């Protein structure tokens, strides 16, 4: 007996009894949309510890996911026309779910493997290329499969042209509502509460359950469901609370907040907070309470650049408090000065009390630095801007408008000190942009390079004699280590000559500028390790790591 195409489709749908109820089709669309957004947000958190959470990385994630969804839409539509068997759709959902469940288990290894391969072969734009390739390898396939859902469901749910608009509109509404929930739940609930790995597992489990309901109700595909369930359970065991920095087994703390990946490590001398697996130190605390040897020591010059006022009588504001390294050092060396900090990540503030001995009398407000300045009227003797992290430089805290706001909150002869964490030497680099922007607001600018690092400290004030004031006050301090450090800052500082590289709220290309400096730093490291490899072979390379 032969059947027309329409009759074949009806017979297929009759075999899949649960699909006679359009509610299940709508729920499929709902959970597919929810899972796509959850995976997208999870992707940003998986990549951030390795490549940063800059706008560039977000662009790569969104772009690759949209490519995957578009290809999935095309394939799903053609597949549904060619063979309108719902088994194929729910099989694809099952495969996508398994792939998503595997991400916590193998994702970090894929990222590091791709980085290792590319670092010796890519001459520029390493972070962009590495993040793009990692995103393509890890996320395109499962989201391509989920992209086939909508056109397939349209095929199964439209019975006649009379109500086709209503049916397609309802499918779109369920997809959109699911996407909204898939946006808010990971960000505000699952990632802060249980982490990125379990977030992937939760939404993979939802998709497996969805496919299981279909296959079990149709009395087909029980083996597929059983195998998927076993793989999912294994992924839960292997991927649960797995470390991003899996090669380190001596971490005091590793976790996530709404804003950051967080890692605390310590040895006999110091405690370190990092927000990136591969590079950078976000905060540091010396257990003996002394100087750190890092940029915080150079920033200590700011209170000593103010004439005719004792440091202990000053009030200091820190934008980008971190774990309070600067505040702790100021308390030790300058006595009972008034210090308050602004930190957007309250989990970092909690870590500062738990691991970094932040003094109890240092007030920390959980807020965005610029928004905080807009909300207050107080003025300060010193304002430290330390909100720049790897290549994640907030554009709203690097513009003329922002630095004008800082200036308005400084007392007479007050000093703004800015930690610029990526020192570049080429024309038009990120530091030149920042320095020129600040110089367009402040009368006098002094900079000093931090020894042994990529940091540069910038001091801005209306006081033309900042360096001379620093020398005089340094010689009067009762701490010999601080005096020597401050005299070193004075000796190595230079007056900045302003240029025309200005950033505004409307135009501040901080991500691209930061990426250029990171590329230069990476290439410098690659040349170093290549030389070791050519001289001493693989053994020498391993010993140097």
Question: At which residue positions do the language-model features occur?
Answer:
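Short acidic active-site motifs
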Residues: 372
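Acidic low-complexity segments
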Residues: 351-353, 357
């Amino acid at each position: 007996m032969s059947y027309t195409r329409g009759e074949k489709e009806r017979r297929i749908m009759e075999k899949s009894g649960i699909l006679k109820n359009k509610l299940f089709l709508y729920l499929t669309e709902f959970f597919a949309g929810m899972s796509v957004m959850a995976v997208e947000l999870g992707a940003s958190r998986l990549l951030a510890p390795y490549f940063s959470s800059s706008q560039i990385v977000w662009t790569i994630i969104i772009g690759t996911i949209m490519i995957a969804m578009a290809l999935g839409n095309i394939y799903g539509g053609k597949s549904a026309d060619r063979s309108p068997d719902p088994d194929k759709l729910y099989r694809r959902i099952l495969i996508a779910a398994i792939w998503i469940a595997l991400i916590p288990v193998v994702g970090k290894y894929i990222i590091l493997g791709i980085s290792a391969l590319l670092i010796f072969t890519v001459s520029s734009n390493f972070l962009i290329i590495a993040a793009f390739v990692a995103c393509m390898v890890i996320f395109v396939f499962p989201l391509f499969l989920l992209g086939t859902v909508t056109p397939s469901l349209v095929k199964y749910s439209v019975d006649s042209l009379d109500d086709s608009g209503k049916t397609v509109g309802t499918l779109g509404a369920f997809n959109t509502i699911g996407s909204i929930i898939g946006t808010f739940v990971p960000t505000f609930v699952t990632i802060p509460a249980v982490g990125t790995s379990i977030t992937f597992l939760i939404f993979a489990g939802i998709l497996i359950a969805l496919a299981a309901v279909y296959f079990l109700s149709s009395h087909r595909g029980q083996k597929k469901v059983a195998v998927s369930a076993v793989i999912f359970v294994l992924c839960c065991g292997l991927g649960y609370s797995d470390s991003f920095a899996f090669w380190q087994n001596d971490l005091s703390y590793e976790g996530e907040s709404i804003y950051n990946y967080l890692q605390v490590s310590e040895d006999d001398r110091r405690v370190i907070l990092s927000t990136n697996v591969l590079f950078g130190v976000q905060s540091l605390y010396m257990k003996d309470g002394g100087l750190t040897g890092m940029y915080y020591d150079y920033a200590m010059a700011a209170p000593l650049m103010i004439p005719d006022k004792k440091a202990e009588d000053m009030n200091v504001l820190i934008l980008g408090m971190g774990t309070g390294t600067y505040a702790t050092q100021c308390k030790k060396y300058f006595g009972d000065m008034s210090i308050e900090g602004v930190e957007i990540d309250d989990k970092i503030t909690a870590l500062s009390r738990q691991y970094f001995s932040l003094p109890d009398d240092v007030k920390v407000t959980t807020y965005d630095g610029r928004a905080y300045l807009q909300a207050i009227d107080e003025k300060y003797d010193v304002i430290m801007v330390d909100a720049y992290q790897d290549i994640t430089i907030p554009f709203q805290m690097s513009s003329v408008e922002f630095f004008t706001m800082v200036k308005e909150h400084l007392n007479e002869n007050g000093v703004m000190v800015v930690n610029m964490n990526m020192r570049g030497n080429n024309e038009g680099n990120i530091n030149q942009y920042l320095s020129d922007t600040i110089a367009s607001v402040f009368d006098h600018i002094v900079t000093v390079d931090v020894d042994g690092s990529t940091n540069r400290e910038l001091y801005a004030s209306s006081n033309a004699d900042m360096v001379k004031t620093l020398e005089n006050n340094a010689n009067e301090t009762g701490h010999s280590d601080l005096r020597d450090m401050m005299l070193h800052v004075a000796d190595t500082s230079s007056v900045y000559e302003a240029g025309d590289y200005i950033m505004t709220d409307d135009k501040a290309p901080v991500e691209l500028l930061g990426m250029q400096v990171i590329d230069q730093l990476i290439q410098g490291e690659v040349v170093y390790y290549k030389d070791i490899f050519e001289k001493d072979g693989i053994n020498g390379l391993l010993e140097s790591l």
